[in-house]
């Protein structure tokens, strides 16, 4: 689960991290009031969306020379006028895709005199079962660009949760960022604070970009992104309360109600599969045959008829879907349950696009019989390759 920047900074501030003063605003009046509280002389008006690249982003409906989603201004009236222009508009960045995201809230923050910019993040390293720390002197840039152009400027080390942060980690961070003296001590303190927050709140990722050195030689968290392990939210009601569903795909929200693993993509072929590995393989083979998947959808191993019906309805709710591939390898999951769910969903919502079904495993013959006797126009597939080839051909033939 992701949260907004202003929420992320509030969470980090609870653990002592040095963040600038700021206030969230949902209206131009609230933005102006926030600026008055801060007092100036410099204010930063920040769009709050779950995507990066806000500063270089473009608002729909404004000219090509218009400012982006992060603006530096010098008066309360400028804060108000910029808020009026930004709120309610769609901001398009390299991370939002062409559809962009509507800006429904702003973060009004005090300005900062920047001497240096760094990148710092903590994330779960699944390979080592440790917390990986990534640091770079190239702050304020996309870390992916740094990794591509100057990979030698990215430094990583891991922290073992069994032992926590040690002085050797402090020295590694100071060396990676080129810090000495008082700044090295501040970096050590910050690492302690961030690691404590990361572990206490079950974070999946903590990213600060940029972490700055101010003109008076202190570290400050200028931007922060936090992502939390969704499976841990039951023990963090304070974090769960920060969820902003307007930033999420409505289909993904609906899928979560049925414990379905669903991620919307930009393609045209909807996929319903059991098992994450098989789902990824299904998406790969669709691309191999010249089309693009419209989603990742794993119904899991213990899906009921109702769950399968819900999954099918979520797929068909996407207007971009021009065909559907159901690919089930029944182990724990029974093929007859999938068949009954698909039929129930088709009868309820109708079938306006080609549907290819590949079943294999537990109760496969019964599943195939249920589908063949349903009277529905379903294309049967013998294996995964056959299924992908048939759905791609059906979609291209329907154009």
From Swiss-Prot:
Enzyme class per UniProt: ligase
Keywords, alphabetical: ATP-binding, Ligase, Magnesium, Metal-binding, Nucleotide-binding, Tricarboxylic acid cycle
Amino acids binding Mg(2+): 209, 223
Catalysed reaction, written as an equation: succinate + ATP + CoA = succinyl-CoA + ADP + phosphate; GTP + succinate + CoA = succinyl-CoA + GDP + phosphate
GO cellular component, one term: cytosol
GO MF term set: ATP binding; magnesium ion binding; succinate-CoA ligase (ADP-forming) activity; succinate-CoA ligase (GDP-forming) activity
Binding of substrate, residues: 274, 331-333
Limits of the ATP-grasp domain: 9-254
HAMAP family cross-referenced by the UniProt entry: Succ_CoA_beta
Family, similarity comment: Belongs to the succinate/malate CoA ligase beta subunit family.
Quaternary context: Heterotetramer of two alpha and two beta subunits.
Protein name per the record: Succinate--CoA ligase [ADP-forming] subunit beta
Organism: Caulobacter vibrioides (strain NA1000 / CB15N) (Caulobacter crescentus)
Gene that encodes the chain: sucC
